[in-house]
Amino acid sequence: MSNHDDLAFDLRPIRHRDCQAIWDILKDPQVQTFNDYDADITKGNVYDFIQGDIERFYNQQGIRLVIVLRSSGQVIGSVGIFNIIDGQGMLGFELSSQYFGKGIMQKVLDMLFEKLTTFVPAPLNSVLALVNQNNSASIKLLTKCGFQEHDAHWVKYVS
């Protein structure tokens, strides 16, 4: 199996049994550097976040998808669009630090926006992302994916 095949992934809706994998990712100091979750996040907090993600999906206010490696079934991150109000949503994502710099998140975002109407039932005109100004990797990623800097946000128009 080639290295490329090892990084092939699928996206699927998050579920409660993903709690441990997501918690492990969020506890990683390299992930915490630019993430907006508290450093002392508990597994219970993550379970509650997942419950909220599931409820937002059913209320057509967002979706969170996990990134699953095809080769192993391992959850290596998540991506979501949430707080969908009046055609505008917020983007959030995290990736296991083991996979930083491998181009996975760009492929994830490309897939998310390519299949947006499949993943997000609510109509969307734009997606915003809040990024720490020191997070050059995420800024580069968002730029490659068509986001534009606007005030303190990064914006992608999708309609």
Pin down the residues of each PLM region:
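Acyl-donor (CoA/ACP) binding surface of acyl/acetyltransferases
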Residues: M1-D28, R64, V68-S159
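Conserved GNAT-fold acetyl-CoA-binding loop/helix
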Residues: Q30-G52, I63
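Generic structural signal for well-ordered alpha-helical scaffold segments
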Residues: Q51-I54, T117
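Short loop/turn motifs at secondary-structure junctions and domain boundaries
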Residues: E55-Q60
